[in-house]
UniProtKB/Swiss-Prot annotation:
Gene3D superfamilies: Vaccinia Virus protein VP39. Residues 1-39 are annotated as: Disordered. It is an enzyme of class 2 (transferase). Belongs to the methyltransferase superfamily. L-isoaspartyl/D-aspartyl protein methyltransferase family. The keyword Magnesium does not apply. Its EC number is 2.1.1.77. The lineage of its organism: Archaea, Methanobacteriati, Methanobacteriota, Stenosarchaea group, Methanomicrobia. Keywords: Cytoplasm, Methyltransferase, S-adenosyl-L-methionine, Transferase. Residues 25-39 have a biased composition (Basic and acidic residues). Pfam families: PCMT. It comes from the Archaea. It catalyses: [protein]-L-isoaspartate + S-adenosyl-L-methionine = [protein]-L-isoaspartate alpha-methyl ester + S-adenosyl-L-homocysteine. It comes from Methanosarcina acetivorans (strain ATCC 35395 / DSM 2834 / JCM 12185 / C2A). The active site is at S98. This is Protein-L-isoaspartate O-methyltransferase 1. The gene is pcm1.
């Protein structure tokens, strides 16, 4: 004969279910609080990093753009804790994400502003493109070319997660530029070339600026300006260390 329940009595099974639910809710709440705390810590670390870079004279506009870009969303999970250290970080396939101070230097030299069309060679994780996306705004656009397919997917995922709709990641040989959307107001190369690739010079608008590391073991950052008549002017801006540009006009 089934056991009769008194009014208000709860079965053992129901009590256990309620207990499990309560425990799960507490666990979820604790996890949410931990995530919020981690996010707060990362934001504080980002602010400290940008302040340190600013001490060395980086442009205020560039610093503000970098402050808006969550670098921790552009590194592999294992490198997240080092996202706001001013150093390059490995992102796999023998590639790195540039040190933040170098991102600031290159963006300064590019003289980026609202509405410009930019070509980047070497998308990597998408971080540099995101910073440039902030600087050119919604009326501008950044096209970034990457030869390693898994990194193309990684960069696209990161940029989507961070909310950048004015950046397009392309799978191609970056040493040849991207003629379909040429000419460009600005071109930046985030890997070292043996010489300045002719297709990139051709795809740079008159009045445009290109930044490119040139060299093998000894590399120099070169700033190129194309005057309104199409004449090229080069200026060396100091020694750097970048991964090599691979492709038809690379190593």
């Amino acid at each position: 004969m089934p056991e009769r329940k008194e009014k208000g009595q709860v079965s053992v099974g129901a009590a256990e279910d309620r207990g499990k639910k309560g425990h799960s809710e507490k666990k979820d709440k604790r996890k949410q609080e931990e995530n919020q705390e981690e996010l707060h810590q990362l934001e504080e670390m980002r602010e400290r990093l940008i302040r340190r870079i600013g001490i060395h004279g980086a442009d205020e506009k560039v610093l503000k753009a970098m402050l808006r870009v969550p670098r921790h969303l552009f590194v592999p999970e294992y490198a997240k804790k080092g996202a706001y250290i001013d150093t390059p970080l490995e992102i796999g396939f023998g590639q790195t994400i540039s040190a933040p101070h170098m991102v600031a230097i290159m963006c300064d030299l590019l003289e980026l502003s609202e509405g410009l069309k930019v070509l980047e060679i070497g998308a990597g994780s998408g971080y540099n493109a995101a910073v440039m996306g902030e600087l050119v705004g919604k009326s501008g656009h950044v096209y970034t070319v990457e030869r390693i397919e898994p990194l193309v997917d990684f960069a696209r995922e990161n940029l989507k997660k961070a909310g950048y709709e004015n950046v397009t990641v392309l799978l191609d040989d970056g040493s040849m530029g991207y003629s379909k959307c040429a000419p460009y107001d600005r071109i930046v190369v985030t890997c070292a070339a043996p010489d300045i690739p002719e297709p990139l010079l051709e795809q740079l608008k008159p009045g445009g600026i290109m930044i490119i590391p040139v060299g093998d073991y000894i590399q120099e950052l070169v700033r190129i300006k194309k005057d309104p008549e199409g004449k090229i002017h080069e200026e060396k801006r100091g020694g750097v260390v970048f991964v090599p540009l691979i492709g038809k006009y690379g190593f």
